[in-house]
Amino acid sequence: MNKIHIGILGAGKIGTAIYNLLVISGFDYDITVADQNILNDINTCDFQRLEIGEDECMLDDEFDKFVKDKTLIINALPYHLNFTAYKTCLEYNIPYFDLSEDDFLDKWIEKKRYISSTRTGVSFTMPHCGLAPGLSTVIANYLMEDFSTVHNLKIRVGALSQHSSNKLKYHTSWSSDGLVNEYKGNCQVISDGKYAEVPALCGHEKLTINGQDYEAFNTSGGIGTFAKTLVEQQKSCVNVNYKTIRRIGHLDYVDFLFNDLDLPNDMLVDIFRNHVTETTKDCVIIFIEI
């Protein structure tokens, strides 16, 4: 049996975390991480410098070679590079795993009918295998099995710093590109038994978890295609929604930046990437109520 060779696209925070977990897993995988620059703690013998762009016409043979000789590909690139990776894996029939929560990519996949209950003849692909969508929707689906009818399903997820020291009540610990995308897209819900989409940064609520007060609000992509799947499978669900958990006061500031000032994406990414301090002392909250 050939040794499993895993290709990781992206050497940022998430790509490096995946790499380190695979290295210590004990399964002795061959692992190669590809990016334009080596950014973090990756063994140089496991790294390949590779130009990865949005324009397919600019891709060279090196990208194709990287993909087609791997057992599987894990995509840890910024969301706007997903199309390149996804389509190349389909072309060479390489299993593809994607952690992103990009609503635009979901719609593209659905339009192409690459993911369906009767799909045949294309490679195995698994979008939405991160935290949200991913772990949180798996837990929610498991909890639903004990109910014949679900009146309300609330999925609340927050990736937060353990402490906050700024007025934003937030410190970055992952992709700034992904954060901005999450705060700007449409949000998928089931409302009164019907699939619908609502704007990000609305639906504000307060909640208390383990004695700590938080706020939550709609953000894009965190539920993936879960709401649409429940409707298509004719599950008896009245209201289903996903919201991001933050410390109280965060929404007022981001609503001002995103909606009142209507700052362009590149400026928003720059603010979160270069002007909001990072932290490695983070915590993840998953709160599901059914």
Model-flagged regions — what are they?
Residues 6-10:
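Conserved N-terminal Rossmann-fold NAD(P)-binding element of oxidoreductases
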Residues 14:
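Hydrophobic/small residue at the entry helix of a nucleotide-binding pocket
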Residues 30-43:
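NAD(P)-binding Rossmann-fold cofactor-contacting core
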Residues 45-57:
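Rossmann-fold cofactor-recognition segment
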Residues 55-67:
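Conserved Rossmann-fold cofactor-binding substructure of NAD(P)-dependent oxidoreductases
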Residues 72-91, 104-107:
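Beta-loop-alpha module in the N-terminal Rossmann-like domain of NAD(P)-dependent dehydrogenases
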Residues 100-125:
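Rossmann-fold NAD(P)-binding glycine/threonine-rich loop
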Residues 146-290:
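C-terminal catalytic/substrate-binding lobe primarily of soluble NAD(P)-dependent oxidoreductases
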